[in-house]
Amino acid sequence: MAESVVIDKPSRAQGDLLPQPPQLSPEEQQRLEQAVERTHLPGPRPSPSRDAAAIFDAVGPSVPATGEAASPVEKAMGAAPLAPGTFTFLQNVDLGAGAPSGYTSVVGEPSVGNNGTAVFQTGNWYAALSTDAGQTFSFVNPFTTFPSVNGGFCCDQSVLYDQSRDLLFWLMLYLPDDNTNTLRLAIAKGQSALSSGSWYYYDLTPQMVGLPTGRWFDYPHLTLSNNYLYVTANVFTISQPYSWTNTVIMRLPLDTLSAHTALTIDYYVTNDHFNFTATQGATTRIYWGSQSLTSWQIRLYQWDEGSPTVSWTDVTISPYPSSTPSCPGPDGRDWCGRSDDRILGAWVANGIIGFMWNASQGSGYPYPHVRVARINESTKAVIDQPVLWSSQVAWMYPAVGVNGRGHIAGPVFSGGGTSYPTLNVFIWDDLSPDPVTSGWETYGVVTSTNGPTSNKWGDYLAARPQSPNSNTWIGTGYSLQGGGANSNARPRFMWFGRERDNSSPPYGATYQAAGFTIGASGVTTVPVTVTNTGSLTWGANSVFRLSYHWYQGNTLIDFNGQRTN
């Protein structure tokens, strides 16, 4: 049974876009790098009997391997139409000044949300805002936008947009002091508030959900249903060795969040299952999953909107190898070793509940790989268990987003062996081959030039439906360029989908001038018939340009006019 707590109305803060971010001092960079070691903390290890069961398929995998990722099409503005089923990138950009080198990390943890042309993306130590649909980004300082609390800001940010209430959520983790820590939930209501940096925020602590002093939240994430926002987190002791004690999910009503008033939070806390991963795509019921620590099962939780009752079903899955993952690349640097088998991606759509997680090498799999379980929403029976694997490289760190059709796609990394860490995108929709019988449909995005010198990567990526074109997706990722240090990590923003769902089809206009006479007064009216080609809906703060030219004798005269809608 869930419990409830009331917290005060939110505070307000004003952020600024910074074309030149302040440089972090060496001491501050060292503090942040050390702080990363305190996040993504592991839970209890599985029982020996569970580990021993991983020999289940030593004769080899029973599902086909996925080949090398295909090369996607990057759609240029105004380009000729492509076949409707063509996978395309509408945006695929480096964050540039939005993620300066002093603020990036090989443990990238990028998250993203968008409200029309305003795109907000975060990583471990940075935040970035685009007001031109992700073409360019400016830096937002997460250290100074809000007042500091507890041990100061670091790491584990999550971003999510709710189109129904026009709210963009920005969840930030503050490190613990001697007593507790804080998850700060900042909200920008409307595109203009997001673009101008106008935020209000609530602070969440472990003590608000009935936990004692000396506990702190780690690894927080966000998801939505029709009428609620959900925050999940793992709870650890502040004192070393940072032992796991609880896992929590909090339910926050969207109407109250929109009204920015005092807030009633419903919450559910457990001490027998580590790490909750809640489903993207939920409507009137949220689901979340957690791996059993003693058997080959996923505990499938469910919580109906408006109900205080949390219930669950234990779903048996196939065993999988769960030793320490390893996937050294050409330079011997191993980017897989920080990962574990907590569930990373979860979705519900079209009567199917799905979960995705990392598994290690072993039991016939030469490299770490991604496990998937699809469950019938009505019967809670397993439908199938696809595997994303290869005999040449590891596949790791999947994220999943659900589009308006209930189809899934998201970023995922590959690499190891002769390949450096590579960012890819997978898609599984009505046009994809069945991964169970034919392997996964994947597309390469960018390949690193090096492996991480610290032998770290992750800890998660993000995928969301694009707003307002919910049949396409936005997603995050990164690569290493020119070296293996934190400063070489380059985050990316991606907007992708099928050509049939391209919200920016070739558009423009043709102009036909009618006959006219140049008057002696020097003022001439030229009747012009404008015929539109394609269509485009302009949202708030959109920018468009009208240009035309004519000849005055042999001199070409140009005019360009720009307008912000």
Predicted regions and their residues:
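Short, solvent-exposed loop/turn segments enriched in Ser/Thr/Gly
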Residues: 520-527
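Intrinsically disordered, low-complexity Pro/Gly/Ser/Thr-rich segments with frequent PxxP/GP/PP motifs
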Residues: 557-565
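Conserved aromatic beta-strand anchor motif in extracellular beta-sandwich/beta-rich domains
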Residues: 546-552
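Short flexible loop/turn segments that cap and initiate beta-strands
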Residues: 538-545
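Low-complexity, acidic Ser/Thr/Pro/Gly-rich terminal tails and inter-domain linkers that flank the onset
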Residues: 500-520
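C-terminal PAP-associated
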Residues: 2-501
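Asparagine-centered strand-capping/turn motif at beta-strand->loop junctions
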Residues: 530-537
